[in-house]
Design a protein with these regions (language model features):
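Central hydrophobic cores of alpha-helical transmembrane segments in multi-pass inner-membrane proteins
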Residues: 8-27, 48-63, 102-117, 144-146, ...
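C-terminal ends of transmembrane helices
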Residues: 18-32, 108-126, 173-182, 251-265, ...
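Juxtamembrane/interfacial segments at transmembrane-helix boundaries in multi-pass membrane proteins
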Residues: 63-87, 122-123, 128-129, 199-257, ...
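Alpha-helical multi-pass transmembrane bundles of energy-transducing inner-membrane proteins
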Residues: 28, 37-43, 136-143, 147-235, ...
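Transmembrane helix-loop-helix hairpins at membrane boundaries of multipass inner-membrane proteins
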Residues: 1-6, 21-139, 214-230, 530-531, ...
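Helix-coil boundary and interhelical linker segments in multi-pass alpha-helical membrane proteins
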Residues: 1-2, 149-155, 288-302, 342-362, ...
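Structural signature of hydrophobic alpha-helical transmembrane segments
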Residues: 3-13, 94-103, 157-170, 236-247, ...
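Predominantly late transmembrane helices and immediately cytosolic-facing juxtamembrane segments
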Residues: 254, 368-372, 438-470
């Protein structure tokens, strides 16, 4: 099935679901409240079914991915705008594949958790917005899934830009129309920041096309030909900045982060999961795929600056998180700190750092997603986002408290959980080149223990707050939503090899393109490489003991 259009079908399935949802009767259809509830339930079930079909199809695609095969697999290239060399070109390497898998796992989870979000059931007291269309909410969610799959799969820079910008539209409406509090302000701020970054990237994309026409060659936006352009060091530096600023805003990396706390706090929990769990990863993915691959000289030149910004972001996000009193805002600032750790691993320019950073993208998506969902479940019961309005929850809702604890411990990278593997690799990879940065990043991890444990202590332990005395524990739908994320955090923490094996060859290719070949990651498809990898792990364990 090597010629089967896996990626196209994966992206089209959610669009088909969106069309089916749009064809269902709306609120203006005749009938009473019971009929409206039945129609809303049908919409939710359609969205869930199509998201699960997308997940199953993506798993089948991953099974057919050949480790040790060509760098980009499941490729498909068709002319789109031939006059300007624009193609519909898609394909995935190991990095893109694991991020697509993370995306299609999170979407059905979010649908289950967001079952009543469109009606405002999870809003704090006094913050319920006007009742909005359930059809529109879940249609936007499925459209967003298509955009997210497309942005990771694109192998044409112009196509990537289209998906990169198109993602803003459904998320803008999900925040502005279905959010809480200052939702419109947060949505506009999110949109303006993103559009500013996108404008800079568009200028760089056009410049790339112009340089591709040098020597009378036909211009192209295809990724692979552009990666082999002979660009001067000066040109690479300027084009790097155009792409990097757009990705730093999307990630977000300090000091481009200020839109995130507002957007994540105003968004419904499900939308916040996709915002922090997936859309942020588009920024860090872009740094690996485009900044380093297309502009290696520019990447090397700006590496010290990016390392410095990453360390500042790690410490700043952690320190500000400690002072937060709003539950969702605290989790948002933890992401600012964690994204700094991811960019640190990327620009350490080592195999361990980039493998760890990519694995951290996946781990962070699951761990922070679980935190946001459970926080949303708490807010829907207590009708408050203030940490001080909780207390003693573990006595009345032990399952909720237990899962919240696991998600929180993942946030501080407890050994045995997937985030520990990620942070360990990032720190090891960084320490081999930037010892001071690695030490300062470790301080950020220590601070993470403070804000996570403080949050848990204030909300879950101590005397039972009278306002939460009747709080019900998680019910079946909520367990089905958050349970898979907790399971993945544990499973990938105990056995990360399948994911790391997918990532390793792609990281190797990226480092080769960046003219960094020492150390070279062992190739998982090579027996000698596997032995070397095992020997390295054993040696590291012995050294640590």
């Amino acid at each position: 099935m090597s010629n089967f259009p896996w990626l196209t079908v994966t992206g089209v399935i959610p669009l088909v679901g969106m069309i089916v949802i749009c064809l269902t009767p709306g609120r203006s259809a005749p009938g009473g409240s019971a009929d409206r509830r039945a129609r809303d339930l049908l919409v939710k079930r359609i969205a869930l079914v199509f998201s699960l079909i997308t997940l199953g199809f993506s798993i089948a695609m991953a099974v057919n991915f050949k480790i040790g095969g060509p760098r980009f697999q499941f490729t498909q290239t068709d002319q789109w705008i031939p006059q300007f060399g624009v193609h519909y070109a898609v394909g995935v390497d190991g990095i893109a594949l694991v991020l697509i898998l993370m995306t299609v796992i999170l979407v059905p989870v979010v649908i289950l958790a967001s079952w009543n979000d469109a009606e405002g059931a999870g809003n704090p007291a006094g913050a319920t917005p006007p009742r909005r269309s359930v059809k529109t909410y879940f249609a936007l969610l499925l459209v967003l899934e298509t955009m997210m799959v497309g942005v990771f799969a694109s192998l044409d820079v112009f196509l990537f830009y289209v998906f990169f910008e198109a993602m803003l539209i459904p998320m803008y409406f999900m925040i502005g129309s279905y959010g809480v509090g200052q939702r419109q302000y947060a949505a506009v701020k999110f949109l303006l920041y993103s559009l500013l970054g996108g404008l800079l990237m568009l200028v760089a994309v056009i410049a790339l096309y112009v340089y591709s026409t040098a020597g009378g060659r036909p211009g192209t936006f295809l990724f692979l030909p552009l990666a082999h352009l002979a660009l001067s060091s000066t040109v690479q530096k300027w084009l790097f900045l155009g792409f990097f600023i757009a990705f730093a805003i999307k990630a977000p990396l300090w000091p481009f982060h200020t839109w995130l706390p507002d957007a994540a706090t105003a968004a419904q929990p499900g939308a916040a999961v996709l915002l922090v769990g997936v859309l942020d990863k588009v920024g860090t993915f872009g740094m690996i795929r485009y900044c380093i691959d297309l502009f290696p000289a520019g990447s090397h030149y700006f590496t010290p600056l990016v390392i410095a910004l990453s360390v500042i972001g790690i410490l700043y996000g952690a320190i500000v998180a400690i002072g937060q009193r709003d539950l969702k805002r605290l989790v948002a600032y933890t992401s600012v700190s964690h994204m700094g750790l991811i960019t640190l691993g990327i620009f350490a320019m080592t195999s361990q750092g980039q493998v760890g950073a990519t694995f951290y993208m996946v781990s962070h998506g699951f761990a922070t997603g679980a935190l946001f969902l459970i926080a949303g479940f708490m807010i829907s019961r207590r009708k408050s986002q203030q940490i001080a309005d909780y207390g003693g929850v573990q006595k009345v809702a032990p399952v909720l408290a237990g899962l919240f604890l696991v998600a929180g411990l993942a946030g501080l990278a407890l050994p045995g959980l997937s985030t520990f593997v990620s942070e360990f690799l990032v720190l090891v990879g960084t320490f081999t080149r930037y010892e001071v940065a690695a030490v300062l990043a470790t301080v950020g991890i220590i601070l993470a223990a403070i804000y996570i444990l403080w949050m848990y202590q204030r909300t879950m332990t101590g005397p039972v707050n009278p306002e939460v005395a009747s709080m019900p524990d998680l019910h079946a739908r909520e367990l089905w939503a958050v349970g898979p994320l907790i399971a993945l955090i544990i499973v990938l923490g105990v056995y990360p090899k399948p994911v790391i094996d997918l990532i390793n060859p792609a990281v190797h290719q990226t480092l080769v393109q960046a003219h960094v070949t020492n150390p070279v990651p062992p190739h998982p498809a090579n027996a000698a490489g596997v032995k070397a990898s095992k020997a390295g792990v054993i040696a590291a364990v012995k050294k640590g003991s």
